[in-house]
């Protein structure tokens, strides 16, 4: 049991955090602003080498009493921490989050007003090109790099639409297996042959050139009154001659359940692409929750309850989970609350988002090993496919693979520094207790089994945690949303009228799309996900392992590994920042410049 003095200390911490009071002044933004009772400045050491082992035993005992598994938030997914220590940790993270977001919050409303004035001076939204006024020379503080180059000029191109599936949201599309997968829907073969150099739909399928994206799960969700959406499924294909990755057909699965192709009238096909993008925007924001926050948190919670803060693995995880426990409660309170930010813009109500997060978590997104960077892409036939030709360009994989490699290299040096002999893993009771706790009590899905005896297993687990926190999260969230995946008019959050009952009936797309007020509302909501001060605050990806509270407790080999990691991330960032369009008007095979994944622009932690 906790003694009275322990409880008094914990209670005072909770009050200070809840009120946002500075408990420890003078901290940088990217370091914890206050210490929890089990924090300290001891060098990291394994339990069998600790010269004060009784302190560790007492610390872990108090942790098991103070960090408890509470009910999930934002859907029925993984546990959310509670208990005396859990509540204090959440309050600390929320206070840090509000400080972190203050800069954007203070600037978003003046910039909203500025964009509104510019739009009014331009005469409002009179055509599809009018939406560009909302972005051009706007949001200079909250989105200093602006919208991705090409997104406002090339948005009608089919290649931009299809290549978004391989860059800004690569988590939906999969290759259809010629023998294991049936064709999900039919398309007129005369149309397919015209688009695919004479190949039929069946031929594309048999050749392993056919890909499928499925958002039909959105069909049963009730819609927000006065707003409409589709629940699209779509085919994409590798062209037999050019090798380009292109769209083939989009089926709405709602209303008259029309199937559109690039052979349809211009407005019909644009409408279909907008409908798909709307579904994709919904997916990206909820999938990222189920795939990153909901997976990383229980792994860390298990460590909090089984490992001393002196354990190097616990230190590694603590560094990644900076501010992590702010997101779900703040999301419940401000974003997915009844009538909150989400409800103000999207076609599906907040509870539909929570329902999808729940379904996605249990079906696949929450599975730890299956969502490994390489494994997930391999399983969907996107890399090293044995039953179809390779993708000519895969921007997500090509850009992120070197980042993952840098993470793995640092993590290998970290693990080998503390486990020079793998037999040490067998006698590390805290390590083994963590693995058991994660699977049995924290109920992490598809986690590594106990006992953990191979260093490569630990390297894989820790590297995947770093990938989830620092890369996977921001591939779908952060700057990506405001720079690309949520940019109007191609990516609306809702339609203003029901889907067309027949093709050939759209004289103008404007009646379906956001008016001036709704367009500004969507833009201002999505820029809030950006964190423009990250790099100068040393909170960006290159600084993932640079925190003084982390490095000071390690030795020279890890300091050297951290320096190499940081330099590699800077080099990757430099390469991304140098990207330009080639003589064909393409970058990485796309008619837009994808820079939102720049390591200098994305946090190393789960910030939104």
From Swiss-Prot:
Enzyme class: oxidoreductase
UniProt keyword annotations, A-Z: Dioxygenase, Glycoprotein, Manganese, Metal-binding, Oxidoreductase, Secreted, Signal
Co-factor: note: Three His residues, the carboxyl oxygen of the C-terminal Ile or Val residue, and a fifth residue, usually Asn, ligate the metal, which binds water to form a catalytic base Mn(2+)OH(2) for hydrogen abstraction.
Residues the entry annotates as binding Mn(2+): 288, 293, 473, 477, 608
GO MF terms, alphabetically ordered: linoleate 11-lipoxygenase activity; metal ion binding; oxidoreductase activity, acting on single donors with incorporation of molecular oxygen, incorporation of two atoms of oxygen
One Pfam family of this chain: Lipoxygenase
InterPro entries to which the protein is assigned, alphabetical: LipOase (IPR000907), LipOase_C (IPR013819), LipOase_C_sf (IPR036226)
GO aspect biological process, one term: lipid oxidation
Signal peptide region: 1-20
Cofactors (names): Mn(2+)
Keyword Iron-sulfur (UniProt): no
Enzyme Commission designation: 1.13.11.-
PROSITE patterns (UniProt xref): LIPOXYGENASE_3
PANTHER family in alphabetical order: LIPOXYGENASE
Protein name: Manganese lipoxygenase
């Amino acid at each position: 049991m906790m003694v009275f003095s322990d409880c008094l200390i914990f209670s005072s911490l909770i009050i200070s955090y809840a009120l946002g009071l500075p408990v420890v002044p003078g901290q940088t933004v990217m370091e914890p602003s206050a210490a929890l009772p089990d924090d300290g400045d001891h060098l990291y050491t394994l339990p069998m080498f600790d010269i004060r082992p009784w302190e560790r035993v007492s610390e872990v005992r108090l942790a098991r009493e103070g960090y408890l598994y509470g009910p999930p938030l934002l859907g029925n997914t993984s546990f959310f921490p509670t208990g005396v220590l859990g509540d204090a940790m959440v309050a600390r993270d929320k206070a840090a989050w509000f400080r972190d977001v203050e800069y954007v919050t203070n600037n978003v409303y003046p910039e909203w007003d500025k964009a509104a004035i510019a739009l009014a001076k331009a005469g409002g939204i009179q055509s599809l090109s009018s939406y560009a006024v909302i972005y051009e020379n706007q949001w200079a503080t909250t989105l200093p790099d602006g919208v991705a180059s090409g997104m406002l000029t090339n948005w009608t191109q089919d290649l931009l639409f299809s290549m978004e599936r391989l860059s800004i949201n690569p988590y939906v599309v999969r290759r259809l297996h010629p023998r294991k997968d049936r064709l999900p829907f039919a398309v007129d073969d005369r149309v397919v042959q015209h688009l695919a150099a004479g190949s039929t739909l069946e031929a594309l399928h048999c050749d392993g050139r056919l890909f499928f994206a499925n958002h039909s799960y959105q069909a049963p969700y009730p819609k927000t009154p006065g707003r409409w959406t589709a629940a699209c499924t779509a085919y994409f294909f590798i062209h037999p001659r050019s090798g380009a990755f292109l769209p083939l057909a989009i089926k709405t699965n709602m209303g008259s359940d029309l199937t559109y192709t690039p052979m349809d009238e211009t407005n019909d096909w644009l409408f279909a692409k907008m409908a798909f993008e709307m579904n994709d925007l919904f997916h990206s924001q909820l999938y990222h929750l189920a795939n990153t926050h909901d997976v990383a948190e229980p792994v860390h919670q298990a460590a909090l309850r089984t490992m001393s803060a002196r354990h190097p693995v616990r230190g590694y995880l603590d560094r990644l989970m900076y501010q992590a426990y702010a997101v779900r409660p703040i999301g419940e309170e401000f974003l997915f609350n009844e009538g909150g930010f989400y409800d103000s813009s999207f076609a599906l109500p907040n509870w539909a988002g929570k329902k999808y997060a729940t379904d996605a978590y249990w079906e696949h997104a929450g599975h730890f090993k299956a969502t490994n960077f390489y494994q997930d892409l391999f399983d969907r036939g996107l890399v090293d496919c044995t039953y179809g030709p390779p993708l000519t360009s895969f921007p997500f994989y090509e850009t992120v693979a070197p980042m993952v490699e840098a993470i793995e290299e640092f993590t290998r040096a970290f693990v080998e520094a503390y486990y020079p002999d793998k037999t040490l893993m067998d006698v590390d009771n805290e390590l083994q207790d963590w693995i058991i706790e994660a699977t049995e009590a924290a109920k992490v899905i598809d986690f590594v089994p106990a006992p953990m005896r191979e260093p490569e297993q630990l390297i894989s687990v820790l590297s995947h945690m770093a990938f989830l926190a620092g890369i996977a999260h921001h591939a779908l969230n952060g700057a990506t949303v405001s720079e690309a995946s949520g940019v109007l008019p191609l990516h609306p959050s809702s339609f203003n009228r029901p889907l067309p009952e027949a093709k050939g009936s759209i004289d103008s797309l404007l009646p379906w799309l956001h008016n001036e007020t709704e367009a500004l509302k969507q833009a201002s909501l999505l820029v809030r996900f950006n964190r423009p001060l990250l790099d100068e605050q040393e909170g960006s990806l290159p600084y993932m392992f640079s925190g003084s509270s982390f490095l000071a407790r390690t030795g020279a080999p890890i300091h050297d590994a951290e320096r190499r990691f940081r330099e590699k991330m800077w080099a990757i960032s430099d390469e991304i920042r140098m990207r330009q369009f080639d003589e064909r008007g393409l970058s990485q095979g796309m008619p837009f410049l994808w820079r939102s994944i720049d390591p200098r622009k994305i946090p190393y932690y789960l910030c939104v």
